């Protein structure tokens, strides 16, 4: 059985850990608010851009459609971009994204598809480096960026465009965590190329006839690469909000668990101390009676 001194040291150690986890929880909560605001602020622009592209795509014929929209007509070669956190202490945030991505990748490989992988985030690279060592074409470390902007997403978009234009891939899918609420982040696979145009994105209500100058095809050639970067940035912003939400929850659970341990250790300490005092009293009384 541990001595009273060891028990006191154990309690002090857990209390120190509890202070750290509580501080990390508060920091994560503050960063979550900023990240959530950034993610929500980016959505109107992304939705409006998608709506414009949907309207333009409706007037483009199959042969004249840009390659990013029409695709190659095959699905033999796939590029899978997996984006998650660069840091840990956030529960299973990164693991859930990687698990969804691996299920997709393994399914494609089982079908005989040629699969290549782009890792965004140190934790993603660490988890995918071994199982897909020969398939990783690029890795990105975003830990040095204080703020996520289009300039951060652009290099990732450039790699995707390079692989696609070089004929190395037919389909590009991005895996990330869609931020729905503080308690719900959903691992999501988003097809980037060929661009998925939702018919519901087009403006509703009475339709007007527009004459475009330059042509719809020329405008799409400019907007589609821009939309690719915007989609990646939106995913990264969702990831950041989801990461801090997961970290806040994980640190809250750790703080609560530390509190439970402190109560349990304190109870054990008090019982041991009481037993020791009782033993000493018995020895004193026994000695007095012997005299």
From Swiss-Prot:
Keyword Cell inner membrane found: yes
Protein name: ATP synthase gamma chain
Keyword Repressor: no
Gene source species: Caulobacter vibrioides (strain NA1000 / CB15N) (Caulobacter crescentus)
Similarity comment text for this entry: Belongs to the ATPase gamma chain family.
NCBIfam families for this protein: ATPsyn_F1gamma, PRK05621.1-4
This protein's UniProt keywords: ATP synthesis, Cell inner membrane, Cell membrane, CF(1), Hydrogen ion transport, Ion transport, Membrane, Transport
Main localization of the protein described in the UniProt heading: membrane
Pfam families assigned: ATP-synt
Membrane topology, from the record: Peripheral membrane protein
GO MF, one annotated term: ATP binding
